[in-house]
C-alpha cells in the first residue's frame, strides 16, 4: 500500500520524537501534529496493519520499513526548509511549505534537485 501524505507525516513525527525523547506515545504524536488522539489511534492502526509501526502497551515504534520512510521524509523536510530559509523565507513559513514540498517530488526529481544544489 502506498502511503498518503498524512501517513508519511505520522511516520516522520514518530521519528523526530524518538530522536528527541526516546519513547514515543500516541499523545506525543497528537500534540506534535496538532491532531486528536483518536486521529492518531486510527492512523496508527492503519500504519501497523501495513507494517510501518509496532504498537506497544504505552508506546509506538517504527519498523525497519517505517524507519526507512520516516528518515527519507525527514531528510527531504530538512532539505526544503533549509532551501527556503536560504532564499529568505521566514522559518515558520519555510517549515510549513517544506512539509508540503517533501511529499510532492519523486525520488528521482528530489535526487536531481539535491545534486544540482
Feature-to-residue mapping (PLM):
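Basic, amphipathic "hinge/linker" alpha-helix immediately C-terminal to the N-terminal HTH DNA-binding motif
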Residues: 58-76
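N-terminal helix-turn-helix DNA-binding core of bacterial DNA-binding proteins
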Residues: 2-35
Amino acid at each position: 500500500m502506498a502511503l498518503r501524505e498524512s501517513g508519511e507525516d505520522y511516520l516522520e513525527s514518530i521519528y523526530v520524537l524518538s530522536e528527541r525523547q526516546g519513547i514515543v506515545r500516541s499523545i506525543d504524536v497528537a500534540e506534535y501534529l496538532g491532531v486528536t488522539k483518536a486521529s492518531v489511534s486510527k492512523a496508527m492502526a492503519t500504519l501497523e496493519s501495513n507494517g510501518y509501526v509496532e504498537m506497544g502497551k504505552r508506546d509506538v515504534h517504527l519498523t525497519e520499513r517505517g524507519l526507512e520512510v520516516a528518515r527519507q521524509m525527514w531528510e527531504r523536510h530538512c532539505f526544503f526548509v533549509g532551501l527556503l530559509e536560504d532564499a529568505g523565507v521566514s522559518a515558520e513559513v519555510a517549515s510549513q511549505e517544506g512539509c508540503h514540498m517533501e511529499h510532492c517530488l519523486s525520488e528521482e526529481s528530489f535526487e536531481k534537485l539535491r545534486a544540482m544544489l
